[in-house]
Amino acid sequence: MPYELKKVFASLPQVERGVAKIITGDPKGNNFLYTNGKSVIIRNIENPAIADIYTEHAHPVVVARYAPSGFYIASGDTSGKLRIWDTTQKEHLLKYEYQPFAGKIKDIAWTEDSKRIAVVGEGREKFGSVFLWDTGSSVGEISGNIKVINSVDIKQTRPYRLVTGSDDNCCAFFEGPPFKFKFTMADHSRFVNCVRFSPDGSRLASAGADGQIFLYDGKTGEKVGNLGGSKAHDGGIYAVSWSADSTQLLSASGDKTAKIWDVAANSAVTTFHLGTEVLDQQLGCLWQKDYLLSVSLSGYINYLDKNNPSRPLRVIKGHNKSIQCMTVHNSDGRSTIYTGSHDGHINYWDAETGENDTFTGKGHTNQVSRMDLDSSNQLITCSMDDTVRYTSLTSKDYSSSESVKMDVQPKCVAVGSGGYVVTLCIGQIVLLKDKKKVFAIDSLDYEPEAVAIHKGSGTVAVGGVDGNVHLYSIQGNSLKDEGKSLPVKGAVTDLAYSHDGAFLAVTDANKVVTVFNVADGYSEQNVYYGHHAKAVSVAWSPDNEHFASSGMDMMVYVWTLSDPDARIKIPDAHRLHHVSSLAWLDEHTLATVSHDACVKQWTVTFK
C-alpha cells in the first residue's frame, strides 16, 4: 500500500451537562470504551495514545459495551439501532444488527455467557428489551418503569437477575431467564442514573440525582442500606463502578468529586476533588484492574490516584468537538501539531507520543476557523468570536493584550514575513502589521474565502466565491490590487503556495485542484481531478513535488506535481466525516483532522 495509518490521536468522550456518560472496560482489562458522535473509541488503558475507532453507525452512538467473552462489542445509537461487531480484527466486521425499539439507546448489559443482551433507553412503545444475541428472540419483557430507563445491569453469576434504573425515580427488579418483572425499589427521590451489580453478584448498587447510593442484596433485591448515611454526595451521582473483588465502589458526581466507598464499613475511604469549575463535574467512572478513571464535563479523562486524591496521575485531554483547522511546527527534530476546534479550544500535540495539552488562560470563545505560524514562534488564529489572536508557542498562554478585534467575523488568516498578517473577514480584507490593523479593503465585488502569502515576493493570493484567485501586493502599510485574477473551476475553498514559492495550488467547490506556475506569470500548470465532492483543504509536502487535498467526500488525495495521474487515494480517511484540514510533518508523513475530533497521521510512500 502506498499509504498506511501510522497514528490515531482519538477524540474525548462527547458529554452533556446533567447526563451520565458511560465508559466501559474490556474483560481482559487492557482497553476501555466510550463514544463521541458516530464513533466508538477503543483506547489502551495503559497507553491511551494507542486507539482504534469504529465508525459504522449512521446516528450518534450513546453507549458501547464488550461482551464478557471479549470477542464482540455491542453499541447502541440515538435511533435505537444496536450493532454487535467483532473486536478481534481491524475491520470490526458486523455480526448482528437489531432495532429493539425506536428511540435513543441509553445502556446495554450482557449475561456472563455472552448469549443474552438487555437494551434500555427512550423507546416510544417500550423502554427496554432483552433478547438472544444471535437470533434476536425475546427472553423476557422489561416492564415496571413508566418513564425513560437510564441504566440496566445483569448479575454476572447464576441465578440471573436484571435491574433497571429510570427517570420515574424507581429501580425495577427482574428474575429470569426468561426475565420477569418482580418488584420496584422506590428508594430514590430523584432520577436513577446508574445501577450496577457487584462482580460476585452479592450486592446491587443504585445511584441517583438525589446524591444517594442505595445497596441491595444481589439475589433477592432486598435493601441493605445506603452509602454514607443520608447522602453519599452533595450533587447528583451519575455513575458507579465496582472493584474486581466487590468490596469497594467508585462513584462520580456533579459535586465535582469522585469517591471510593468501603461497602462493608459503609463509608468513603477516599475522596477525589477534581476542581471547582462547572466543567469539573464528574459524569462517568470506571474501575478496571488498578486503574480508576473518571470523566469530567470538559470531556477530560482523569486517571485517579488513591495515594494523592487531590491530583490525578494523568489527565487525557484532546478535543470532543469537531476540529476545524491545524498547523505543524517543527523544531529541534520534533514536530508539534496545533489544532483548533468548533468550541474555541486550541490543543498542541507531540506528534510522536500523542501527549497533548491545551493553551492556558482565556482564549477564543467560539470556533477557531484558521491558524498559521509566524517566524517569531507565534500561533496566529482567527475565530468566529471576531478576533485574531497571537499566542506564543513558548509560553502557550493566552494573553488578552495579544488579541486584535475585527469589525466583522474573520474566516481565514495568512502570515507573511516582516510581521505582516492578512485576515479575510466577511466582505473585507484586513492587513495587520505587528499586531495592529493598518489597512482594510471594504469595497470588494466578490466574497473572499481563502488567503495565502508568497513568502518571497509578499504577493497575497485571495480566493473568492466568484471562482477566481485575486492577487494583491503588500506595499508598506497597504495592499495594492495587482489587477490580475486567476480563474479556477468553482468557488475557491483553500489555496497554498509551495514551500519554495514556485507554485500555487487552489481547491474549489467543483471538486478540482488547480496548480499555477508562479514564475511563469501564474500560468495554469495542471488541473487535478479525483474528488467526488467539494474539495476543502490543500497542503504542500516539504519536497515541493507532492501536495495533498481533502474533500467533503471523506477522501484524501496525494498528488504528484509533474504527473496528475500519479495520485495516491486515501479513502474514508476519517469515516463518515469530511477531512477539514491537512498538514505535512515531513516528506512522508501527512497529518489529517476532521469533524470526528480525531487527529490521524499517515505514512505516504511514493514509487
UniProtKB/Swiss-Prot annotation:
Q: Which Pfam families match?
A: WD40
- Biological process, per Gene Ontology: actin filament fragmentation
GO MF entries: actin binding; actin filament binding
Q: Which UniProt keywords apply?
A: Actin-binding, Cell membrane, Cytoplasm, Cytoskeleton, Membrane, Nucleus, Repeat, WD repeat
Subcellular location field: Cell membrane; Cytoplasm, Cytoskeleton; Nucleus
Q: Which GO terms describe its cellular component?
A: actin filament; cytoplasm; nucleus; plasma membrane
Which PANTHER family is this protein grouped with? WD REPEAT-CONTAINING PROTEIN 1, WD-REPEATCONTAINING PROTEIN WDR1
Q: What does this protein do?
A: Induces disassembly of actin filaments in conjunction with ADF/cofilin family proteins. Doesn't sever actin filaments alone, but caps the barbed ends of filaments severed by cofilin, which blocks annealing and depolymerization and allows more extensive severing by cofilin.
Which family does the record claim for this protein? Answer: Belongs to the WD repeat AIP1 family.
Its protein name is WD repeat-containing protein 1
